[in-house]
Amino acid sequence: MAWRAGVLAPGLAVGWCLAVLLFAGLRLLGQHPGWHVDLVVLILLLMALSAWQLTHLALTLIGRRPAGWQSWQLVWRHKGAWLLVELGLTILALPLGLGGLSSRLLVRLPLPADFINYVGLNRRPVGITVAIIYIVVAGVCLLRGPWVFRRLAPQIRRPGSWRQMVVALLIGAGLMGVWWGLAEGIVTLNWWGDARLAAGLAKGLAAGSLLLIFLGFVVAVILAAITLVWSWCGQPAVSRPIPRRQGWWLVTLLVIAGGCVSAQALESTPQFAAMVAISHRGVDHGVGVQNTLGALRHVSQQRPDYVEMDLHETRDHQWVVLHDENLAVLAQRNATPHQLTLAQLERLTVHENGYHDHLVSWSTYLRTAERLHQPLLVEIKTTPQDSAGAVRRFAHQYGARLRRDGSAVHSLDYRVVAQLKQTAPQLQVGYITPFNWVAPASVPADFYSFQRISVSQQFILAAHQAGAPAWVWTPDSPAAMIRMWALGADGEITNELSRLQRVVRQRPGKNWWAVVQNFVFSCV
């Protein structure tokens, strides 16, 4: 009964419809990076409407049947508190996707490069700290949320208990779970259709699927919101509403909004662009030991655009080709590169995937790659033990040579990126993002290597707006590769190079399912 009253009671249906239209407008305008007046206006309108809708919904559920102006009056009286509440709810909802608005907001977040770099280099302790704070804040909201809401709507006589809040959250999670299951079923249907239907029919199926998924998401979110507010109000008995005839125009507006969002997802560019194929750590399908000459010689036969490999500084200030900061896994020796000289490291045998090989110096690896005419993507690893000026020495010694070879350098440490560009400005230098949470323009680079799990089309578009290619690491399954291709990534860094090369030889028209899948992921 609460769901029916929350949807059909006077004023609420129109309010939900307007909220969906504003939400759709934000998705449409927020697709491309940058702040615009119309985008800010839409955000402010959605915040104001959300406050009114929740207030009007609460008063309706407790049987007050207020006029619309009365709810607006109550919202205006508590406008400061509402602003704080909505900001808090937005922050809590950001990790949950915010209905696809999270990436549209985060890609516009400018922060100092030093702060971004600190978070990236200390991502584990920072991540744990943020997770603890998030859990504490979410717990406080769970326990005190109903009392805060009562202050915003004093007519509520008995606010909900924490048990009622837990039940409401479980119901909301269940609704989203049902939506997710149905959406994945629709994705599977599109995968089946792509393989069997003509190109036009497959694209039409994708268009209809996107519309259904969007409308289903809207319904699930509205019902979850009604359940939450009903629990904030103490789950009162709700009388049967007297619905007003809203007319088909409301349904028509929702379908039009959903159609616009679906069309944007289907037709947005870039999609299925030319792909740069990059072998991760110089390995293809587990043949050879990562970052060794044997693996390099094998993978170069597949002619990747780049072979990605890693460098660590040694105790005698040389460079060894190695990814791990400890040799325990590959060489069964509990030591770091900084504890051994290059000569000692070259004598070590490393084992992986049933193969064995020797560690190799950077100069030897580079000469071998040049003989094979194989461009490299060099990742410079950093530790607190690195010598002062190591990166600048690298740039002076190898910058011009790497540029002649058509090679590039990237790093997780933005200090490396900045120093290389200052010392060797003609060298192509990129920044590796451990996760995607700020405007790429905050950390300028020649290209970006985006972490795959949290990348979105908005981050790829932001990189393109800055004139930088967007590469993604490390999709290994065919499904992940196709999804990144459908997002518009310019390159993929993968452990399965030959698989990626087969994937990008497919016709894009046979992979509309990936566009639908990306849309599902964009909602959460």
Model-found features: residue ranges?
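Hydrophobic alpha-helical membrane segments
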Residues: 1-275
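Phosphate-group recognition and catalysis centered on beta-loop-alpha active-site segments
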Residues: 231-524
